[in-house]
């Protein structure tokens, strides 16, 4: 990865803006991006891994026609007329578990507003109806972290969705769609697809696709690319009205990351690099359309709030698609207890023993977590400095074991145990435990479809089209020996920034 400074040059680009990094992001962001300056495509990512479970519960509680991100409909109302006038395309994964229903709702809104825009939707990601069939074909959905087959999880499967790629989006745009409603697609697909449409890229234009993959990866999480959640936050001039990111992508896959003028935040080599490291496990970033080699990138500061990224090499995509599976992992309950003064550990032990003796022992629970957080100080200057927290959490597939009775047993000890008892929150009723189960499925079983104007088109995964594999071979880099001499201690965070990324219950850290 090369860092530097670049003079701004004018080139033919497609300007792809982001207006959402998660379900619950700033509602006015779509209108802000459409009205704030010239863009060609408005995109939004709403689907964190566990969001699929939220949408599943929505379908269960409100009907089978639900299961999509309803707030996106408000955003469509806000921007549809302007997008029509400015010829701005909209591509989003807000379709969630029900892209067809969302497309129908959007068409109703457009009809009410007398706005003529073509709406396409994509499906084929839902693997739930096919799990048994795929098991019989040898697809075991082994957990990518634990290598355990799904059938051995001991949990009920709630949702199972393959991460689709970008070619369905390109197909929809090629056929004249103005709004493309996607289900579970890769976060970067909503950027790769429009770029491939703009420049007419072929399936094997791996370097260009890898560049768009990097661009999509950088802007998919909204303001994390423009100064939000940034380790060196003191560099950010203002956090008032932080601008959402825009990727200006060129025909060769090079791109510039920027934001609308007059907005807060910051676009710098640091903010872009931090987001590049987000949620990746290695420099070779796998995607169903291409493998992007992020260690080949060159990153240059073009001007204030403009960062140019180029040189990303690409390889043939893997023969598998990743699947996002969510399981019902039982129920949990717990409470935080505050301990003050002397003998903190003895107080925690006395309470823990009394509690589990009163409920019949720890063994009846599937999991028990007991943590004593020693935030107290030896010679405190205030009551707050004298406090420690005892956190007790229990989990069981049986909701009765971790229900209100467990909470009541904690409260029953309030006058019969350590001195100064009071709770810091939690308890009452049990909450569901959702287990994220990342897995792979052979791409030959992926059946993706684009629906527009009453016609349906099947999209074949690139890895199943018979192309010759093309893998980038990286030259080995010599690592200079560590410098020697006098040293001084300094906090790691003064020299290195970090960006954490989570996939359900799993997390990694890029430094």
Labelled PLM ranges:
Residues 4-5, 9-32:
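N-terminal amphipathic/basic leader segments beginning at the initiator methionine
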Residues 10-13, 49-65, 84, 126-155:
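Gly-rich Lys/Arg/Thr-decorated short loops/hinges at beta-loop-alpha junctions or inter-strand turns
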Residues 38, 311-490, 503:
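C-terminal non-catalytic interaction/assembly regions of soluble proteins
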Residues 93-98, 177-194, 498-510:
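Conserved phosphate/anionic-ligand binding catalytic regions in large, soluble enzymes, centered on
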Residues 111-127, 192-233, 237:
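Catalytic or ion-translocation cores adjacent to nucleophile or general acid/base/metal-coordination motifs
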Residues 116-119, 225-238, 283-301, 358-373, ...:
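Flexible, glycine/charged-enriched surface loops at secondary-structure junctions
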Residues 209-308:
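A conserved active-site cap/scaffold subdomain adjacent to cofactor or substrate pockets
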Residues 279, 283-305, 466-496:
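Short, Gly/Pro- and small/polar-rich lid/capping loops
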